[in-house]
Amino acid sequence: MHTVELRFYEELNDYLPVARRKCCFTHAFDGTPAVKDVIEALGVPHTEIDLILVDGESVRFAHRLHGGERVAVYPMFERFAIRPLHGLRPQPLRRTLFVVDVHLGRLARYLRLLGFDTLYATDLDDAALIAISVRGRRVLLTRDVGLLKHKVLTRGYWLRSTNPNRQVEEVVHALSLEKDLQPFTRCMSCNGVVRPIARSEVAGRVPPRVFKRFRRFTCCLGCRRIYWRGTHFQRLERLSRRRRFTRARHRA
């Protein structure tokens, strides 16, 4: 039997029992397991980890532990390069894309409202979600911790909140996306890009009273849905402005 001293930082502490949060603790193990296996045995999915230091040196997930080491584990720095340290994903994302688990439809719509490319469908099983995430380099958003422990996944985030309003704030904070908000540039229904369209082109495609009242229209390039600044738009605009998109104050 061997032991190792571990310390988890920032939001990774959410996965740990209270007694092990924000402090060093000792963990016992047999053999020479990979550091990834030890970490996930403690409940922390590898997709939320971007840096592991063993005795002050950055290591890969496959690094073997022999006992007596001190291990520090840090969350993903999704938008920042951390070289020359060994980040545990191929490279940080410069444009963050999402795929959302099947029970998170409202979150998907809110992310699209804010301008983020977000794939969502109610018929996607776990295998499909994982494949889309890996192939498209999309961050998989889910409430299922077990899903994030799949070995081929490299990008994922476990949502702490069950409230869609809180969830969208949580995602923006966790991935440092405050400066990337582009409200009303994506279709909330299909995720297509929304562009301005000439008023003359919407004649007959919107109710006569709408055509008479409004001068500016936009159109989804995917599903061709027409948008205008009516009551629905104003309600969504209030929703967008109400999001508390200020930097989260996490402390290790």
Regions found by a protein language model. Give the residues of each.
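Short cysteine-rich clusters marking metal-coordination/redox-active sites
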Residues: 187-190, 220-223
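Surface-exposed, charge/polar-rich loops and edge strands
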Residues: 183, 190, 243-245
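Short linker/helix segments within small regulatory modules
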Residues: 62, 204-216
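Short functional micro-motifs and their immediate structural scaffolds
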Residues: 192-198, 228
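Long, charged N-terminal interaction/targeting segments
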Residues: 61, 70-182
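Residues immediately within or flanking Cys/His clusters that coordinate Zn2+
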Residues: 184, 217
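Ubiquitin-like/PB1-type beta-grasp interaction modules and other compact soluble beta-rich domains
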Residues: 1-97
